[in-house]
Amino acid sequence: MKQTLDYIDDNRVNVIYQIPLAEIVFDFFDKLKSSTRGYASFDYDMSEYRRSQLVKMDILLNGDKVDALSFIVHKEFAYERGKIIVEKLKKIIPRQQFEVPIQAAIGQKIVARSDIKALRKNVLAKCYGGDVSRKRKLLEKQKAGKKRMKAIGSVEVPQEAFLSVLSMDEDAKK
């Protein structure tokens, strides 16, 4: 919400806004610097606390909650932020031997989901031609092994994943 707009001289403007602190944390500084090519600066003061509808968003990797990726977001923007973060994490987290679901959840409700596909070895490479039942047996054996790995496997989260949660730029939507 804009409060004042003062022209200091021909090249400088002083604009005073009231913005929620959460919006400043999520990529405001980077957007300000990139849109002004580094010329703008900002200073902030805490004006007051206001009641708002906030929710805690948890990020689940392979069904396990990652506390370091949890954050508080306004209820109105929860779906969009969850979708952006899930897509970013899908690009950053390396593929595993098993399929890894990435979910954004508010309480028990899943608001966004994406899957990292599993790496697969071509088990049919040594089967030339013929027997369909042999091929099916090999694929079923691989499927059972992947299911077993998924049950006991854990996912390593790279360091840049934690930093990417804080930057909400538009390239995640592409």
Curated annotation (Swiss-Prot):
As for what it does, the entry says: Required for accurate and efficient protein synthesis under certain stress conditions. May act as a fidelity factor of the translation reaction, by catalyzing a one-codon backward translocation of tRNAs on improperly translocated ribosomes. Back-translocation proceeds from a post-translocation (POST) complex to a pre-translocation (PRE) complex, thus giving elongation factor G a second chance to translocate the tRNAs correctly. Binds to ribosomes in a GTP-dependent manner.
Question: What is this entry's stated membrane topology?
Answer: Peripheral membrane protein
Q: Which SUPFAM superfamilies match?
A: EF-G C-terminal domain-like
Q: What is this protein called?
A: Putative elongation factor 4
Q: What class of enzyme is it?
A: hydrolase
Q: Where is this chain's protein located in or outside the cell? A: Cell membrane
Task: Report if keyword Membrane is assigned.
Answer: yes
Q: InterPro entries, per this entry? A: EF-4 (IPR006297), EFG_III/V (IPR035647), EFG_V-like (IPR000640), LepA_C_sf (IPR038363), LepA_CTD (IPR013842)
Q: Name the Gene Ontology biological process terms.
A: positive regulation of translation; translation
Recall the taxonomic lineage recorded for the source organism. Answer: Bacteria, Bacillati, Bacillota, Bacilli, Lactobacillales
The reaction(s) annotated as catalysed by this protein in its Swiss-Prot or TrEMBL entry are: GTP + H2O = GDP + phosphate + H(+)
Q: Which family does it belong to?
A: Belongs to the GTP-binding elongation factor family. LepA subfamily.
Q: Which UniProt keywords apply?
A: Cell membrane, GTP-binding, Hydrolase, Membrane, Nucleotide-binding, Protein biosynthesis
What is the scientific name of the source organism?
Streptococcus pyogenes serotype M18 (strain MGAS8232)
Q: Which cysteines are joined by disulfide bonds?
A: none
> What EC number(s) does its UniProt record assign?
3.6.5.n1
The record's Pfam families line, in alphabetical order, gives: EFG_C, LepA_C
Reading the lineage from the top rank, the first entry is Bacteria
Q: Which GO terms describe its molecular function?
A: GTP binding; GTPase activity; ribosome binding
Q: Which GO terms describe its cellular component?
A: plasma membrane
Main localization, broad class: membrane
